[in-house]
């Protein structure tokens, strides 16, 4: 049994004035219990985790299917970002809103005695984080809910690979995972030939999911597993380099195609992200990249484009530049980045860019772009930089993903999930 005193409150994104208002117990005692449950279901996940220590009944709501279903439907969307340092044993969560703050959440991965982590962060979707096995060969993909510490593994991937690129799209009752590239054609050689797609849906047979027939990647594809994939309108998008191109995978058709990116000769550290979406509308695919062109008429910058009409087939789609980093902000960002590249993710209206640093350290800085307000601002320094002290394991360094803390991730129930070990709250100290 966990001790609720060990869970300091996560900084709230709401105003401090509301926190000063006390609840009148004479009112709350007289409220019908169904109404109280309805109110609790409307709370953000961090707020409910703090409140569950108030009484035993609130705690037991965590194991009530009707309550978890209501919370999934009614609780507000939280556009958090998860920074994953493979050797650190925990996530660093950034709340990018106006009162930006950091918090910490333990990772539920099983420990590996006497060696580096056997799984590395690969993707995230709908409150789930995906971790890919490091060993070459047929890959294991683990899905984890860090809040409930629920773990589930997909069936072993059918094609042996070295370091493939992973995409994940999870809904309340479905999971789609793509494992692409780095086919092991021999014990000593890899080629970007194919992709494997796993599909699980509560309405499918079997509901526990299956690996679809492999799909062929476009010729001359060169994938970077750190770049990951974006998902929108039933399609996955990922970057190919040398030269740069955007690969598009239509899940329903099981077919890949190419879309040309803007200014492809002058891109550096490009990343594809999902902008917008959530409960307010469909997500758009966006390209975030540094632009470096020798001509003085095109100064160095970081730009953001969105794609319209980027479907399958003949490589159609039009890119529209929607934002450009201001020169004074870019000067600070370029100094922090130092030519090492940057990690990038988008969640709702927010885009986070984090300069890459030393292997075993968490990010020292993060730049937040609010696309709705067209505003660039630096997040406060991460207070947990020194906690990544488990040696030099995880040579790829940290990754950043869009992450929404959720009490309920019912899609993971489609897999053979392990029982929850314990419930973890979010630590801010």
From Swiss-Prot:
Organ and tissue specificity: Expressed in apical meristems and the lateral organ primordia throughout development. Expressed in seedlings, roots, leaves, shoot apical meristem (SAM), developing panicles, and, at lower levels, in developing seeds.
Compartments it resides in: Membrane
Pfam families attached to this UniProt entry: F-box
Stretches assigned to the F-box domain: 25-71
Mutation effect (residue 15 to P): In PBN6; bigger peduncle diameter due to larger vascular bundles, increased number of primary rachis branches (PRBs) and of the number of grains per panicle, thus leading to increased grain yield
Biased composition (Pro residues): 1-11
Membrane topology: Multi-pass membrane protein
Sorted UniProt keywords: Activator, Developmental protein, Differentiation, Flowering, Kelch repeat, Membrane, Repeat, Transmembrane, Transmembrane helix, Ubl conjugation pathway
One GO cellular component term: membrane
Region (Disordered): 1-21
Pathway this chain belongs to: Protein modification; protein ubiquitination
Induction cue: Induced by ozone.
Free-text note on domains in this protein's UniProt record: The F-box is necessary for the interaction with ASK proteins.
Note: Ozone has various impact on different cultivars; O.sativa subsp. japonica cv. Sasanishiki exhibits ozone-induced leaf injury, but no grain yield loss, and, by contrast, O.sativa subsp. indica cv. Habataki has grain yield loss with minimal leaf injury upon ozone treatment.
Subunit organization: Part of a putative SCF (ASK/Cullin/F-box) ubiquitin ligase complex. Interacts with FL/APO2.
Function recorded in the entry: Component of SCF(ASK-cullin-F-box) E3 ubiquitin ligase complexes, which may mediate the ubiquitination and subsequent proteasomal degradation of target proteins. Together with FL/APO2, involved in the temporal regulation of meristem identity during both vegetative and reproductive developments in an APO2-dependent manner. Promotes spikelet formation by suppressing the precocious conversion of inflorescence meristems to spikelet meristems, probably via a positive regulation of class-C floral homeotic genes, but not of class-B genes, and through the control of cell proliferation in meristems.
Entry protein name: Protein ABERRANT PANICLE ORGANIZATION 1
Organism of provenance: Oryza sativa subsp. japonica
Native organism taxonomy: Eukaryota, Viridiplantae, Streptophyta, Embryophyta, Tracheophyta
């Amino acid at each position: 049994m966990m001790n609720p005193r060990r869970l300091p409150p996560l900084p709230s994104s709401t105003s401090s004035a509301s926190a000063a208002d006390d609840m009148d117990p004479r009112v709350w005692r007289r409220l019908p219990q169904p109404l109280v449950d309805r109110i609790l279901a409307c709370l953000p996940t961090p707020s409910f985790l703090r409140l569950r220590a108030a009484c035993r009944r609130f705690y037991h709501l965590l194991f009530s299917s009707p309550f978890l279903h209501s919370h999934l439907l009614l609780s507000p969307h939280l556009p958090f970002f998860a920074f994953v340092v493979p050797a650190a044993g925990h996530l660093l969560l950034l709340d990018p809103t106006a009162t930006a703050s950091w918090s910490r959440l333990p990772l539920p991965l099983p420990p590996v005695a006497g060696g580096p982590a056997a799984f590395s962060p690969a993707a995230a979707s709908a409150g789930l984080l995906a971790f890919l096995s490091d060993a070459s060969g047929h890959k294991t993909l683990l899905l984890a809910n860090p809040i409930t510490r629920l773990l589930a593994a997909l069936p072993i991937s059918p094609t042996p690979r070295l370091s493939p690129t992973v995409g994940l799209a999870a809904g309340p009752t479905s999971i789609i995972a793509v494992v692409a590239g780095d086919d092991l054609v021999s014990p000593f050689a890899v080629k970007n030939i194919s992709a494997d797609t796993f599909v699980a849906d509560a309405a499918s047979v079997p509901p526990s999911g299956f690996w679809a027939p492999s799909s062929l990647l476009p010729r001359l594809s060169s994938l970077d597993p750190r770049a990951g994939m974006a998902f929108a309108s039933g399609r996955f998008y990922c970057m190919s380099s040398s030269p740069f191109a955007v690969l598009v995978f239509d899940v329903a058709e099981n077919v890949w195609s190419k879309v040309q990116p803007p200014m492809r000769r002058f891109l550096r550290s490009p990343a594809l992200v999902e902008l917008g979406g959530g409960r307010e509308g469909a997500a758009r695919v966006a390209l975030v990249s540094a632009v470096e062109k020798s001509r003085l008429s095109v100064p160095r910058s970081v730009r953001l484009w969105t794609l319209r009409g980027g479907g399958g087939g003949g490589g159609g789609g039009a890119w529209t530049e929607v934002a450009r980093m201001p020169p004074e902000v870019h000067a600070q960002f370029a100094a922090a980045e130092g030519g090492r590249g940057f990690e990038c993710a988008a969640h709702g209206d927010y885009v986070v860019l984090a300069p890459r640093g030393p292997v075993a350290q968490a990010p020292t800085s993060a730049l937040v772009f609010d696309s709705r307000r067209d505003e660039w601002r630096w997040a406060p320094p991460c207070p947990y930089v020194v906690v990544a002290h488990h040696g030099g394991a995880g040579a790829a360094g940290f990754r950043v993903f869009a992450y929404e803390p959720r009490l309920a991730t019912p899609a993971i129930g489609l897999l053979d999930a392990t029982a929850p070990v314990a419930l973890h709250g979010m630590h801010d100290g």
